[in-house]
Amino acid sequence: MGERKAVIKNADMHEDMQETAVHTAAAALDKYEIEKDVAAYIKKEFDRKYNPNWHCIVGKHFGSYVTHETQHFIYFYLQERAFLLFKSG
């Protein structure tokens, strides 16, 4: 795994969970090339660690407007991709 620096653009999430999100995203990028598979991996890991219902969007070009549970939202960049991870429902 090469040097990676995440740029957190917006977060309503405890710092330890933010770190887990970035590390999980890095692991997903190591394991998968297709963005849908990267998103599925992150979503499943967060469902397992922090209980359902997590939603994850990964890509280079997308807009979003979501409702999320308090303290369960992060939007960041890693390796030229945007990651939107939030819990709702």
Swiss-Prot record:
Asked if the Swiss-Prot or TrEMBL record annotates the protein with the keyword Signal, the reply is no
Could you tell me where this protein is found in the cell? Cytoplasm, Cytoskeleton
GO CC annotation terms, alphabetical: cytoplasm; cytoplasmic dynein complex; microtubule
Principal cellular location given in the protein's record: cytoplasm
Q: Which UniProt keywords apply?
A: Cytoplasm, Cytoskeleton, Dynein, Microtubule, Motor protein
Family matches, as SMART domains: Dynein_light (SM01375)
Query: Which Gene3D superfamilies would you find in this protein's record?
Result: Protein Inhibitor Of Neuronal Nitric Oxide Synthase
Matching entries from Pfam families are given as: Dynein_light
CDD domains found in the cross-reference section: DLC-like_DYNLL1_DYNLL2
Which GO terms of type biological process are on file? microtubule-based process
Q: Name the source's superkingdom.
A: Eukaryota
List, alphabetically, the PANTHER family matched: DYNEIN LIGHT CHAIN
What is the protein name for this chain? Probable dynein light chain
